[in-house]
Amino acid sequence: MAEKTYSGFVAIVGKPNVGKSTLLNNLLGVKVAPISPRPQTTRKRLRGILTEGRRQIVFVDTPGLHKPMDALGEFMDQEVYEALADVNAVVWVVDLRHPPTPEDELVARALKPLVGKVPILLVGNKLDAAKYPEEAMKAYHELLPEAEPRMLSALDERQVAELKADLLALMPEGPFFYPEDYAKSDQTFGEWVAEILREEAMKRLWHEVPYAVATKVEEVAERENGVLYIKAILYVERPSQKAIVIGEGGRKIKEIGQATRKQLEALLGKKVYLDLEVKVYPDWRKDPEALRELGYRSSVG
Ligand SMILES: Nc1nc2c(ncn2[C@@H]2O[C@H](COP(=O)(O)OP(=O)(O)OP(=O)(O)O)[C@@H](O)[C@H]2O)c(=O)[nH]1
């Protein structure tokens, strides 16, 4: 029986230089690879994935709250609210070395509509370097009394671990957004995509054909319209297999391509254009060079 999993989104917000990146990096620890350039949407930018046991947090950035001064003009910007409204928790970071500034007030105002909808954790950071942390914290808390205050240093492992545990506990039940080993593996994004393509191809092929299939991603490009363009090759060993993979009227390859695209779009949360080609690579399974080229680094023989 499958064990229950818990997963959700957490936004880390706050004015510049308060320590958001430091905190995020230390929450993620060594296990997680930052995935910044890939899954970008206009509303949210993924900053990292944390998976611990059966719990997963996808940390997101909220463009618009990053530089609150810029957001002043369009303060009621619906997009900011929408981006924040569907996260499972907000971490609002402030700098305890100083009292609040107008920029902090702007962040507080932007968060106000979320009160009662999403837990807001007010993290007073740089506790190690603050002279009057209690006073500062009190002033920040007054900007948004509904937020749950805590003081820490993003550089303190134990304090960050406590915050991490609390955030993980806030995640609702649900399937992981990313494969469990995704963030931990040293796979490149292309290798990860190639594996998903191979999985979808194998599901739809019979007899010896599935094992003759290898996949490779040749190009990944972020298009201006927000679509992720992916060029991938599906290799087989013989022309007869190529015909099977393509299928009558190209039906089989279309099916494989669509399933792959759908899975990628669901995992990445963005539109994908998959440019898929079938090529014959004679006896690639017996060719050490081919194996290396196709990413089977050590599994010759
Ligand atoms: N003493 C101390 N310094 C910290 C702490 N957390 C972060 N810093 C320092 O504060 C500075 C800003 O940290 P960042 O993590 O870059 O801040 P940020 O909020 O991500 O900044 P932006 O990317 O400009 O929004 C860096 O020099 C950090 O080393 C802390 O807990 N204690």
Curated annotation (Swiss-Prot):
It comes from the Bacteria. InterPro entries: G_ERA_dom, GTP-bd, GTPase_Era-like, KH_dom-like_a/b, KH_dom_type_2, KH_sf_prok-type, P-loop_NTPase, Small_GTP-bd. Residues 125-128 are annotated as: G4. It is found in: Cytoplasm; Cell inner membrane. One of its GO terms (biological process) is ribosomal small subunit assembly. Residues 152-154 are annotated as: G5. GO terms for cellular component: cytosol; plasma membrane. Residues 205-282 form the KH type-2 domain. Pfam families: KH_2 (PF07650), MMR_HSR1 (PF01926). GO terms for molecular function: GTP binding; GTPase activity; ribosomal small subunit binding; small ribosomal subunit rRNA binding. GTP binds at residues 14-21, 61-65, 125-128. Residues 14-21 are annotated as: G1. Residues 40-44 are annotated as: G2. It is a peripheral membrane protein. Residues 6-173 form the Era-type G domain. An essential GTPase that binds both GDP and GTP, with rapid nucleotide exchange. Plays a role in 16S rRNA processing and 30S ribosomal subunit biogenesis and possibly also in cell cycle regulation and energy metabolism. The Era binding site on the 30S subunit overlaps that of protein S1 and is in direct contact with 5 nucleotides directly upstream of the anti-Shine-Dalgarno sequence; the presence of Era may prevent mRNA recruitment. 30S subunits bound to Era are not able to bind to the 50S subunit to make functional ribosomes. Era may serve a role in the final stages of 30S ribosomal subunit assembly. HAMAP family: GTPase_Era. Monomer. Binds to the 30S ribosomal subunit, between the head and platform, contacting the 16S rRNA. Contacts ribosomal proteins S7 and S18 and may contact proteins S2 and S11. NCBIfam families: era (TIGR00436), PRK00089.1 (NF000908), small_GTP (TIGR00231). This is GTPase Era. It comes from Thermus thermophilus (strain ATCC 27634 / DSM 579 / HB8).
